């Protein structure tokens, strides 16, 4: 067969272009509906991919919000997307219309991670019986963790003591606390999943943290959005082989830990941890093809909990210490409350939180100000729904701009500043605000919220009970502007920890 001539090539190119334009027009039809949300005009074949900075999506969405309003539409190649902004619209979408908006979109790149067809996990699971079963199990396991043995609070308290000991080794010298915070939170998750902790210099924990950090960068890239929007590209071997390599390495390490752990499981013994509890449910469900308790779901659930549970809490703690050295008056007030309620002898306990309104307000304000997951996890509509009068068709990817709620000028007195008074009334009592939703809202609210609250309170109070933190002498004042990725990290900084 001979090569195509120039005229033939031109004809083929024109035919392909016409075909792509027709496909593009077909996918744009819903944008012409009377009540479909407005939005920027998509580029044929690309949609609005080039108009969104995926490393700082919240910033892009804020600019588009000023132009198109609280509910606007985008198109990622041929995937319809709606972005919801502001407290009223986000609450309507996630809470009032939760039955319609709690599904998850299919992300084709996830097929490269090596999980079988029965694996959904919890975070990315479709809104249905399997998700309900796994969420119920996970919430119950977190609540009943260590029944008859060490409680989860004991694990966190003991790890806080190890963290303080590690900080003591750096006392008086400038250092970056990020790595130590990562290791401490990693050990809490490891105790929950594997009933074990790692020494801070263990090569396994160092590799886990390295792969997790790289995974954040991978998932923040435009490349991932393009591949999820044009999954046909994943059929190209050289493309598929390079996608999500760090995440695959992270999963492989977790698989190794899981295999080591499972050799010690005994069905007739009380569960040591969440994994044992899952294996027990698998044992009970043998022969039940409808059960979501299977090996592949266990692998994905472990990776979900390890990744999401570790990163968000350690990053928030890193923000907390940064804000304490930038606001020494707030730090002193927290320490005064710690001294009054807890003292310098015993360890902090969760029961102390109710008697420490200022400290509680500071922790909440750290979460609000840091705003570390500004766009949340994407949802998908499972049927036609309405938000703020706009019609959102079934199968639309839905982003909720949580940053627009946490920084809403109509709700917060000083939305762009660190101000613990946002969570205190005139008498100094703690007040939780409706617009405080760093964990999202509705049925898909982060299932690890109770654990995160416990870790933040116990680690934060333990550190400020033992140390005073400051900007190292001779160093410039660090910035309180974050570095946007999938999770907003604080700009690199060092501090000095001085024993009190």
From Swiss-Prot:
Its EC number is 1.14.14.1. It is a peripheral membrane protein. Its main location: endoplasmic reticulum. Keywords: Endoplasmic reticulum, Heme, Iron, Membrane, Metal-binding, Microsome, Monooxygenase, Oxidoreductase, Phosphoprotein. The modification Phosphoserine is found at residue 249. It comes from Cavia porcellus. It catalyses: an organic molecule + reduced [NADPH--hemoprotein reductase] + O2 = an alcohol + oxidized [NADPH--hemoprotein reductase] + H2O + H(+). This is Cytochrome P450 2D16. Cytochromes P450 are a group of heme-thiolate monooxygenases. In liver microsomes, this enzyme is involved in an NADPH-dependent electron transport pathway. It oxidizes a variety of structurally unrelated compounds, including steroids, fatty acids, and xenobiotics. InterPro entries: Cyt_P450 (IPR001128), Cyt_P450_CS (IPR017972), Cyt_P450_E_grp-I (IPR002401), Cyt_P450_E_grp-I_CYP2D-like (IPR008069), Cyt_P450_sf (IPR036396), Cytochrome_P450_fam2 (IPR050182). The lineage of its organism: Eukaryota, Metazoa, Chordata, Craniata, Vertebrata. One of its GO terms (cellular component) is endoplasmic reticulum membrane. It is found in: Endoplasmic reticulum membrane; Microsome membrane.
């Amino acid at each position: 067969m001979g090569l195509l001539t120039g005229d033939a090539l031109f004809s083929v190119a024109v035919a392909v272009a016409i075909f792509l334009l027709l496909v593009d027009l077909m996918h744009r039809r819903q944008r012409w509906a009377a009540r479909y949300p407005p939005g920027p005009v998509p580029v044929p074949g690309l949609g609005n991919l080039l108009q969104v900075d995926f490393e700082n999506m919240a910033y892009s969405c804020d600019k588009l919000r000023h132009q198109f309003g609280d509910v606007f539409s985008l198109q990622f190649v041929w995937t319809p997307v709606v972005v919801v902004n502001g407290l009223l619209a986000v609450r309507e979408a996630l809470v009032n219309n939760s039955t319609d908006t709690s599904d998850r979109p299919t992300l084709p790149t996830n097929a490269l991670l090596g999980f079988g067809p029965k694996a959904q996990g919890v975070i990315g699971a479709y809104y249905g019986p399997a998700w309900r079963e796994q969420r119920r199990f996970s919430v119950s396991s977190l609540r009943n963790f260590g029944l008859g043995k060490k409680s989860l609070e004991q694990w966190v308290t003991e790890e806080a003591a190890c963290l303080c000991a590690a900080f003591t080794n750096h006392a008086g010298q400038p250092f970056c606390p990020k790595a130590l915070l990562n290791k401490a939170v990693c050990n809490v998750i490891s105790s929950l999943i594997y009933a074990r902790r790692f020494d801070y210099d263990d090569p396994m924990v160092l590799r886990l943290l390295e792969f997790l950090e790289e995974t954040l960068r991978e998932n923040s890239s435009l490349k991932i959005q393009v591949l999820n929007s044009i999954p046909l590209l994943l059929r190209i071997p050289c493309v598929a082989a390079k996608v999500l390599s760090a995440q695959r390495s992270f999963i492989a390490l977790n698989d190794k830990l899981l295999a080591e752990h499972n050799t010690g499981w005994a069905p007739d013994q009380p569960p040591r941890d969440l994994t044992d509890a899952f294996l027990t449910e698998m044992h009970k469900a043998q022969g039940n093809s409808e059960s979501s308790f299977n090996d592949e779901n266990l692998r994905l659930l472990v990776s979900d909990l390890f990744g999401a549970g570790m990163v968000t809490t350690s990053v928030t703690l890193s923000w907390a210490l940064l804000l304490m050295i930038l606001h020494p008056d707030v730090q002193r007030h927290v320490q005064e409350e710690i001294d009054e309620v807890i003292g310098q002898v015993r360890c902090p306990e969760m029961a102390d939180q109710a008697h420490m309104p200022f400290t509680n307000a500071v922790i909440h304000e750290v979460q609000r100000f840091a705003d570390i997951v500004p766009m949340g996890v994407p949802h998908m509509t499972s049927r036609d729904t309405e938000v703020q009068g706009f019609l959102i068709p079934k199968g639309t990817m839905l982003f909720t701009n949580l940053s627009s709620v946490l920084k809403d000028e109509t709700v917060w007195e000083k939305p762009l500043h660190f101000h613990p008074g946002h969570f205190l009334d005139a008498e100094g009592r703690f007040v939780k605000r409706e617009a405080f939703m760093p964990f999202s809202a509705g049925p898909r609210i982060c299932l690890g919220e109770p654990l995160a609250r416990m870790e933040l309170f116990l680690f934060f109070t333990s550190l400020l009970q033992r140390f005073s933190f400051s900007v190292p002498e001779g160093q410039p004042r660090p910035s309180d502007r974050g570095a946007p990725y999938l999770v907003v990290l604080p700009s690199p900084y060092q501090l000095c920890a001085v024993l009190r």
